[in-house]
Swiss-Prot record:
It comes from Leptospira interrogans serogroup Icterohaemorrhagiae serovar Lai (strain 56601). GO terms for biological process: CTP biosynthetic process; GTP biosynthetic process; purine nucleotide metabolic process; pyrimidine nucleotide metabolic process; UTP biosynthetic process. The lineage of its organism: Bacteria, Pseudomonadati, Spirochaetota, Spirochaetia, Leptospirales. It comes from the Bacteria. Coiled coil: none annotated. This is Nucleoside diphosphate kinase. Signal peptide: none annotated. The gene is ndk.
Length: 137
């Protein structure tokens, strides 16, 4: 079993896709270890996305991610990172396979409904950013 971190982004929350996405998580065989509904401060968004700080989209990304509530979750199943990446689809919803979360719910490449860790190492870092050990079950 491995873990991954997922986030339902502000557009996914605003457009009322949280229930559908959580249902999909369970249908895909993930165990939800931790779940939080919160609004990131701009400072927290900058810290979370600091790996992108040199990229031209960094400030827009941080402003967007702190613009409204998000849902953060730690998930577990076999091949968690890879499986979640397959479930959500390509970053650009125009390129996402039919039936993936981004094909179904994303507005654009930027407002693409969900985030998913891209490696086991990043999953561990991202989970620890949002959850303390006693908050995971």
């Amino acid at each position: 079993m491995s873990r991954t971190f997922i986030m339902i982004k502000p557009d996914g929350v605003k457009n009322k896709h949280v229930g559908n996405i959580l249902s999909r998580i369970e249908k895909e065989g993930f165990k939800i270890l931790g779940l939080k509904y919160l609004k990131l401060s701009l400072e927290d968004a900058k810290q979370f996305y600091k790996v992108h700080s040199a990229r031209p989209f960094y400030n827009d990304l941080c402003n967007y991610m702190s613009s409204g509530p998000i849902v953060a979750a730690a998930l577990e199943r076999d091949n968690a990172v890879l499986h979640w990446r397959e479930v959500i689809g390509a970053t650009d919803p125009k390129e996402a396979a039919a039936g993936t979360i981004r094909a179904l719910y994303a507005e654009s490449k930027e407002a693409n409904a969900v985030h998913g860790s891209d490696s086991d190492d990043n999953a561990a870092l991202e989970i620890s950013f949002f959850f303390k050990g006693n908050e995971l079950f």
